[in-house]
Amino acid sequence: MVREARANRSSFLKVKCPDCDNEQTVFSKASTTVKCVVCGRDLATPTGGKANLKAEIISEFK
């Protein structure tokens, strides 16, 4: 029972870049800086746990 509750703490997120409106998939607990592939803006920065997102979340994949 504990394993089921702890299994889904992270997910993939589809985010939208605020500068160029490019949609990109990022991991919710990214350990490196994620940049937009089109314009190069930082979309997510690592914090030691969940990433600090600087983009709009469109959808979540669990």
Curated annotation (Swiss-Prot):
Zinc-finger ranges (C4-type): 17-39
Record GO cellular component, one term: ribonucleoprotein complex
Entries under InterPro entries matching the protein: Ribosomal_eS27, Ribosomal_eS27_Zn-bd_dom_sf, Ribosomal_zn-bd
GO BP term, pick one: translation
Required co-factors: Zn(2+)
Keyword annotations: Metal-binding, Ribonucleoprotein, Ribosomal protein, Zinc, Zinc-finger
Domain of life the protein comes from: Archaea
Annotated Zn(2+) binding sites: 17, 20, 36, 39
PROSITE patterns, sorted: RIBOSOMAL_S27E
Pfam family, one: Ribosomal_S27e
Recorded family membership: Belongs to the eukaryotic ribosomal protein eS27 family.
Oligomer and partners: Part of the 30S ribosomal subunit.
PANTHER family found in the cross-reference section: 40S RIBOSOMAL PROTEIN S27
Name assigned to this protein: Small ribosomal subunit protein eS27
Species the sequence originates in: Methanoregula boonei (strain DSM 21154 / JCM 14090 / 6A8)
Gene name in the database record: rps27e
